[in-house]
């Protein structure tokens, strides 16, 4: 994986003696790739790429976004109109969000149509479904953060859906909203989910997903 000039350098040897870099790189480079693999098997990697773009652009916007019902919309306008390249960062965030959902859906269809969910990869499929649910939750929570008319009513509708569940429906609505009505507590909860809870959740699920794929390899042709 490394050139001869690199492996013979003293710096490389220093790191290799302590971290076994060569062994790790050989293990990565020597992983068998079945001959039937085509471009459609890259959809999972494209979904991950979109997530990394989301993470970077979202992190950049947290320096300017204000998660309050009185300042959220104005802070988004400030990002779009005043911050250097803010319009580009937010636009990339929105575009990559849509692309991430699309790539995720196509990836799920590819795995299903090629039988990648069958034994012994059932748990990989289950974790993948959990990743899909987390991705959709990212979209729902992020949609509300500008706190414009679209975001407000989207939150009101989504948070009101659990009310149809018998016995615990009203309690779930209150839990999601933070109070009986949509307001500051709701925005705070959605912001916390979007910027802290969900990123950690998806990071753990991605790690499990990749470890399983690494262990079991790519499924064979139908």
UniProtKB/Swiss-Prot annotation:
Coiled coil: none annotated. The keyword Iron applies. GO terms for biological process: photosynthesis; respiratory electron transport chain. GO terms for molecular function: electron transporter, transferring electrons within cytochrome b6/f complex of photosystem II activity; metal ion binding; oxidoreductase activity. Keywords: Electron transport, Heme, Iron, Membrane, Metal-binding, Photosynthesis, Thylakoid, Transmembrane, Transmembrane helix, Transport. It is a multi-pass membrane protein. Heme b 2 binds at residues 90, 93-94, 194. The chain crosses the membrane at residues 39-59, 97-117, 123-143, 193-213. It is found in: Cellular thylakoid membrane. It comes from the Bacteria. PANTHER family: CYTOCHROME B. Belongs to the cytochrome b family. PetB subfamily. The 4 large subunits of the cytochrome b6-f complex are cytochrome b6, subunit IV (17 kDa polypeptide, PetD), cytochrome f and the Rieske protein, while the 4 small subunits are PetG, PetL, PetM and PetN. The complex functions as a dimer. This is Cytochrome b6. It comes from Synechocystis sp. (strain ATCC 27184 / PCC 6803 / Kazusa). The lineage of its organism: Bacteria, Bacillati, Cyanobacteriota, Cyanophyceae, Synechococcales. The gene is petB.
